[in-house]
């Protein structure tokens, strides 16, 4: 069975070794044929905490790593220039 892959944007990086990736799925409405956008948020494993807010990433399906985390960061496609702030 092939592993699923998704491309999305990091919308939260506040957790340790975890990021939230928003994936936008666009499809035509079955009756009205208008293009509808649906956003799904996935929690993905980021072991080195390399992703920051706004990064475009590719995630892949993996074994369950926690109660809600079943995806892992495969690669960072577009890195944002936003520097991560250090809390004091």
Curated annotation (Swiss-Prot):
The alphabetical list of record keywords is: Ribonucleoprotein, Ribosomal protein, RNA-binding, rRNA-binding
Please indicate if the UniProt record lists rRNA-binding as a keyword: yes
Q: Provide the Gene Ontology terms for cellular component.
A: cytosolic small ribosomal subunit
Kindly give the CDD domains that the UniProt entry links to this protein: Ribosomal_uS17
| Single GO MF descriptor | structural constituent of ribosome
Provide the GO biological process annotations. Answer: translation
Q: Which InterPro entries match?
A: NA-bd_OB-fold, Ribosomal_uS17, Ribosomal_uS17_bact/chlr, Ribosomal_uS17_CS
The record's annotation in PROSITE patterns points to:
RIBOSOMAL_S17
What function does the entry list?
One of the primary rRNA binding proteins, it binds specifically to the 5'-end of 16S ribosomal RNA.
The record's comment on protein family reads: Belongs to the universal ribosomal protein uS17 family.
How it assembles, according to the record, is: Part of the 30S ribosomal subunit.
> Which NCBIfam families is this protein grouped with?
PRK05610.1 (NF004123), uS17_bact (TIGR03635)
Q: What is this protein called?
A: Small ribosomal subunit protein uS17
Source organism per UniProt: Prochlorococcus marinus (strain MIT 9301)
Q: Which gene encodes it?
A: rpsQ
């Amino acid at each position: 069975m092939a592993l699923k892959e998704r491309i999305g944007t990091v919308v939260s990086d506040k957790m340790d070794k975890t990021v939230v990736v928003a994936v936008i799925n666009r499809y035509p409405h079955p009756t009205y044929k208008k293009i509808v956008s649906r956003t799904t948020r996935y929690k993905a494993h980021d072991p080195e905490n390399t992703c920051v807010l706004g990064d475009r990433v590719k995630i892949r399906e993996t074994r369950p790593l926690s109660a809600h985390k079943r995806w892992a960061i495969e690669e960072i496609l577009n890195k944002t220039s936003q520097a991560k702030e250090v809390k004091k």
